[in-house]
A protein has these predicted regions:
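ANL superfamily adenylate-forming
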Residues: 13, 52, 139-196
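Conserved AMP-binding/adenylate-forming core of the ANL superfamily
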Residues: 23-28, 36, 44-89, 93-97, ...
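Conserved ATP-binding/catalytic segment of the ANL
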Residues: 29, 74, 85, 392-394, ...
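Adenylate-forming
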Residues: 38, 48, 60, 64-67, ...
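Conserved adenylate-forming
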Residues: 71-76, 186-197, 202-245, 266-268, ...
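A short helix-loop-beta submotif of the ANL/AMP-binding
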Residues: 81, 87-107, 111-115, 123-129, ...
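Conserved AMP-binding/adenylation subdomain of ANL enzymes
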Residues: 223-243, 251-291, 306
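Gly/Ser/Thr-rich phosphate-binding loop
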Residues: 290-295, 304-365, 378
Length: 431
């Protein structure tokens, strides 16, 4: 795959916001250290806001360490897959870091999946344990016998709410609260993790075939994408002082990387909305004054159409980001006039951890554009026939992307990995 001079020159760098560097050093450290570093730096700052209750970073780490200890006692070891099938809630944050800290692999599972869909992901990944809601326990139990799932841990939204409603018991499952209560002393193992080769997350994607495939995202892939996306934020942001409003789900890689991981890296309080409702969203904006709000087009349109959106103080949100689908330019213009903030668009895919492109905050937007590549992200358009030869800018072709965020491959799918990832003459891997 030969580079053309047009792409090799990387003309998009000239359009970066003034504070964004085109090249950076990315941590070659396990993802689990993100929580450890933040909890050490700002232990008493708020980490979450959920149904009237909150946790500090020290509390999140303490509970995550207890769960990690429990998982080790259960027999979960490095490389074992553990599923999380939850809406946005503090338990997701706690579980994800517990799994990562002991070298396990997080398998994100959509809570809206049917038993058949859960079974497909569970069987393909070989997950040994699934953490889910009490209300979803019947779906999980329905597939347990046909998969490698050995145990199901349940929790409830009410457990982490201000009312602290206990999770009801469900036969055939273990309550997460009981599991944590049984750990009186944490004993996290010292697991050797190679960030560039060890998988952190299996993110299932149907792609164009409709057959779920697990994109293997390494610790390095996701950590790099966290750095790539957070450097885009205005430089006056301060660690522990920001608030990110999260209605985009953690189980989607957009929410997992940009919300859960990047939010933790920045020490931002994560204001969690478990299910989208425009009134609940606007109420959260009024009560918490988030500084950053990533979402999808339908959410921004619903806010724009709300007759009293301004009364909730939406103009206090500093930055908005839209992903998953393009926004009409008129919607962007109307939204920015209403809020006074900046609404950036981005592009990505599960196989890229996921963000690869974004629109700069200060540059003029081009209608219909997905934006420009992130730092250290190269792109080229290749012809549709061979899929190898770069075409001239403006010509029709297939987008190819290279960068530190590109996946390791598809789980147990060597042929499809070979078809999706290709090396150039310099040995660089392109998606």
């Amino acid at each position: 795959m030969a580079d053309s001079s047009s792409y090799a020159a990387k003309p998009w760098i000239d359009h970066y916001d003034y504070w964004v560097q085109p090249h950076m050093n990315y941590p070659r450290r396990p993802l689990g250290e993100i929580l450890k570093l933040t909890a050490s730096a700002i232990p008493d700052r708020p980490a979450t806001a959920f149904l009237g209750a909150s946790l500090t970073w020290a509390e999140v780490k303490e509970r995550s360490d207890r769960l990690g200890t429990a998982l080790v006692r259960f027999g979960i070891a490095k490389g074992d897959r553990v599923g999380i099938m939850l809406p946005n809630c503090p338990q997701y944050l706690i579980a994800a870091f517990a799994i990562l800290r002991i070298g396990g692999i997080v398998v994100n599972v959509n809570p809206l999946y049917t038993p058949r869909e859960i079974g497909v992901v569970a069987a393909d990944s070989g997950m040994r344990l699934l953490i889910t809601l009490d209300l979803l326990a019947p779906n999980a139990l329905a597939v347990r016998g046909q998969t490698a799932i050995e145990a199901i841990m349940i929790t409830s939204a009410g457990e982490q709410s201000v009312a602290a409603v206990p999770c009801p018991a469900v036969e055939g499952t273990q309550r997460l609260s009981d599991v944590l209560a049984n750990v009186t002393e944490t004993n996290m193992p010292n697991v050797s993790i190679d960030p560039e080769s060890d998988v952190a997350v299996l993110q299932y994607t149907g792609g164009t075939t409709g057959v779920p495939k697990g994109a293997m995202l390494t610790h390095y892939n996701i950590f790099a994408n966290v750095i790539q996306t957070t450097v885009l934020h205005h430089p006056d942001q301060k660690r522990g002082e920001e608030r990110i409003l999260l209605v985009i789900p953690y189980f989607h890689i957009y929410g997992f990387t940009v919300g859960l991981m990047a939010g933790t890296w920045q020490g931002a309080q994560q204001i969690l909305i478990p299910k989208y409702d425009v009134e609940a969203l606007l109420t959260a904006i009024r009560d918490f004054r988030p500084t950053y709000f990533p979402a999808v087009p339908t959410i921004y349109v619903s806010i724009l159409n709300h007759p009293k959106a301004r009364e909730y103080g939406i103009d206090k949100v500093r930055a908005f980001n839209c992903g998953s689908a393009p926004l009409p330019l008129e919607v962007i213009d109307q939204f920015e006039r209403m809020t006074g903030g900046t609404l950036n668009e981005g592009y990505g895919l599960s196989e890229a951890s996921p963000v690869t492109h974004t629109t700069p905050s200060l540059s003029r937007r081009k209608p219909g554009s997905i934006g420009i590549p992130l730092p250290d992200t190269d792109i080229k358009i290749v012809d549709l026939v061979s899929g190898l030869n770069a075409v001239a800018p403006g010509a029709e072709g297939e987008l190819c992307i290279a960068g530190p965020q590109i996946m390791k491959g598809y789980w147990k799918r060597h042929d499809e990995t070979a078809g999706a990832l290709r090396k150039d003459e310099q040995g660089r891997v392109w998606l």
